[in-house]
């Protein structure tokens, strides 16, 4: 008789019976453990492997390593996201002005409706008035008086800001470029006084003489009300073939710039409460000033959006490059002039050679302000071209000069730290 089912083939059927129906097995005979058996019994069983994640979680919660020893704490995802958020907030605070300017331009390019409506109600004039009102509120007389010690360096800085650097405008006007407003705007930028806040802030960061920086900033902007119209008429009007209304421009700058500065300064000096409030909320006033300044390019770009979109990216890149080269030229000129002046003075240590004075002059005298340029463009009413095209390259130049000078300040600080460590 042929056997069709071998007995070994029936084992799988028996093993497939549910667990509940199986007969209980007798415990195996005890065996002596071997080395391999011990290792497999430690690493092999499933219930021990399942316990390891629980041990690791308990160790992380208690600040210990999974092996039981105290180790370095691993940063939790919530802590990592919190530190990233703090870093982003810190970056936004330290770079609020460039970010606000970029945001204003981007908003105008996406939807110009609100910007055109703001122009209809002359919002840019009120924003400019507010900027210089804040400048007057934050201006300290005591700090201005402290700069008298370095008056030769301050005098050179003022001459560089108001006389020497505007001279470059006539060479920039010789560049043949389309649209011509880009080059005209950069030439006008050369004729402006120094920045209202960034030069002083960077001087303070690098350990320069803040009082000297403040003095040059305040005096150059006040004198600029009288000198800027003359510089524009001489270097820009002749090159552009137009006659600028110098007297009208001077009166408008007095109304838009000088009067709000005087009002702010008088309010600060006559009321200790106002002065204390302003000094205690410097960050808030700085943010407010940046927001007011960002409204201007937002309005100008909204008006000129169709023209800006017709400009080739290559042309804009060339204008940005010219602005960067212009700032490098101003830095090189001021640094070289200070070096020469320090060699000419033989008695003791020259004020031109002292780092705290030299750095203040280099930073402040090499920067140009955007609000005064905007006020000038607003008052000219298109005499030199489309307002938006005049302002756009200057906004880029303003942002680039802050970035470049921030890099220089960081390099100076690192070098000072190396010298201090070497001592």
UniProtKB/Swiss-Prot annotation:
Mode of membrane association: Multi-pass membrane protein
Keyword terms: Chloroplast, Membrane, Plastid, Transit peptide, Transmembrane, Transmembrane helix, Transport
InterPro entries: Na+/solute_symporter_sf (IPR038770), Put_Na-Bile_cotransptr (IPR016833)
Presequence range in chain numbering: 1-55
Predominant cellular place of this UniProt entry's protein: membrane
Subcellular location: Membrane; Plastid, Chloroplast envelope
Superkingdom, natural source: Eukaryota
Region (Disordered): 23-45
Membrane-traversing stretches: 96-116, 123-140, 153-173, 182-202, 212-232, 244-264, 284-301, 315-335, 389-409
Annotated PANTHER family: SODIUM_METABOLITE COTRANSPORTER BASS4, CHLOROPLASTIC-RELATED, SOLUTE CARRIER FAMILY 10 MEMBER 7
Protein name: Probable sodium/metabolite cotransporter BASS4, chloroplastic
Gene: BASS4
